[in-house]
Amino acid sequence: MKTKTSTNTITKAAVIATLYTILILLQTVLPFQQLTFGPIQLRLAEGLTVLPLMESAAVPGLFVGCLVSNIFLSFMSGYGMIDIICGSLVTLLAAYLTRKAKSKYLAMLPPIVLNGFLVSIWVSYFSGIPYFTTVLGIMGGEAISVVIEAPILPPCQP
């Protein structure tokens, strides 16, 4: 029985990782490519960051999806290994904290706040745009993405 649960969890995580990656890759061919990386980020896939509240497999799924996306698109971002490693770890931490949230409203905060304050460190450094300006750009884009997806969540997850 435990193997079935593990297989089920891995499958769900893989589906979420794939969906995240596909959404990021799709965005790079749409007219919104410049919003995928940089001081203003509006990633369509970031709407998925509220999924850990409903599904524990979303925690590793989002991490792997972000990691794969950042690897594939590292040539576009210009941030290299720091974005691949640190960006993916920020997503993992945000997903974990989202999973622990007591309500869907609190669940929206970790991806918005952590991406805003942490990802802005290297984006600001490499882009030359002031840190707090970058924080506002990344937090704003993250908030838009997350708030669009939040209505699909149940009121609270046990």
Describe the predicted segments one by one.
Residues 2-57:
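Hydrophobic transmembrane alpha-helices
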Residues 2-6, 63, 127-132:
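Juxtamembrane loop-helix boundary motifs flanking transmembrane segments in multi-pass membrane proteins
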Residues 9, 13-17, 57, 61, ...:
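Small-residue packing motifs within transmembrane alpha-helices
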Residues 25-38, 47, 67-158:
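Membrane-embedded alpha-helical hairpins and interfacial helices in multi-pass inner-membrane proteins
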